[in-house]
Amino acid sequence: MVEYWKRNFFMVLVLQAFYLANCLTDEEIPEEWLLLHVLQGQIGAGNYSYLRLNHEGTIILQVQSLKGDADIYVSSLTLNPTFDDYELQSTTCGLDKITIAHHLSRPVGIGIYGHPSHMESEFELKVYYDRTVREDPFADASYDPEVLEAKQRQQQQQTSLDSSQEEESVLRTILIGVLKIVLELLF
């Protein structure tokens, strides 16, 4: 019986070791992401550390809490975002990740907050640039004079064809109406 419990206890320890090893390994970074900057820092409980992002394009921020719990808040409206005033946030324990879209106005304020559950938090911030080219959803709606002119000509031809058919229809209706009146008068 003791051997049974020893074996089970050993299995639990092995499983915990595998789980811990998986948690500590870095997440795979796509090839399209270019590492721009790495910053390590410390933040006291309930305090903020502020950064400013001027780089254009799609930016990915990864904050890894090395000790304690550091959360991240982002805003294009204020350079000092807080947990009350932000546009993007990530407040998980461990790895926090935020994607700042390319259309968000720059500069962007970044606030790293030391959660009060720990007296001091250590963090590592990695800033990535996403090089993937995304199609502009409004590209088809943009102004191209040649395409616009061709569409206008096509619409004019269509409206002239429609108007000639409409004129024929009106003439037929009038002619049929006159014939009905004449036939009523005669009979």
From Swiss-Prot:
Keyword Calcium belongs to the record: no
UniProt-annotated location(s): Secreted
UniProt xrefs under InterPro entries: UPF0669
Cellular component GO terms, alphabetical: extracellular region
Domain of life of the organism encoding this protein: Eukaryota
Signal sequence, start to end: 1-23
Pfam family, one: UPF0669
UniProt keyword annotations, A-Z: Glycoprotein, Secreted, Signal
Residues carrying sugar: N47
UniProt family annotation: Belongs to the UPF0669 family.
Name recorded for this polypeptide: UPF0669 protein C6orf120 homolog
Organism per entry: Xenopus tropicalis
